[in-house]
Amino acid sequence: MGLELLFQGNQLNRLLHGLWITAEIAFISVFFACFFGIILGVLMTSKNNIIKAITGFYLEFVRLIPLLVLLFLAYFGLAKWFDIHLDSVTVCILVFIFWGTAEMGDLVRGALTSIEKHQIESAYALGITPLQTFIYILLPQSLKRVTPSMINLFTRMIKTSSLAMLIGVVEVIKVGQQIIEHSLFTNQSAALWIYGVIFCLYFVICYPLSLFSRYLEARWEN
């Protein structure tokens, strides 16, 4: 059976270490993406045409350029054009932050603009300043509404992190490929079992997050 491959030597530990690299990339990226995304989302609601143009261009640029292209540009371009040499994990985290910030910013923008205007007008009528209105009324409600989507962004980052293998990151899928290639001639069913285990590992991480996101949505809707 192909499953026995996992218990030969340190194969299982290698897979789990690869999964840890995947989770580490996703966690660090989503943490900073949420922080910068909140700032970006606030800027995207600005009435200043220059700020709106810059943030709009950034969002469209990230959406139009495939993430894989951004990874290649950052990994090979920084070294060639600017003589900046970063390891593949660092490059992957930076690109994911760049991508995630745009996604999170758009989510925050949508949450801010979805808040009823009469709440803002009522706050002003009570003598609350615009800054206080934003901090105590708009921001808490927006973060509450955007939290399920933020969790979904985290799961997307976990799944999308498999692209990191193309710039040399030894994450869980890369480790799986190495095990399969090493065992290809001795066990032809190795790919089925190894990828099956990788699927289960992704499922164990992502499915609880998905359930938690649905729980929050259902609870806050009621």
Which role does the model predict for each range below?
Residues 1-222:
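Transmembrane alpha-helices and adjacent helix-loop boundaries
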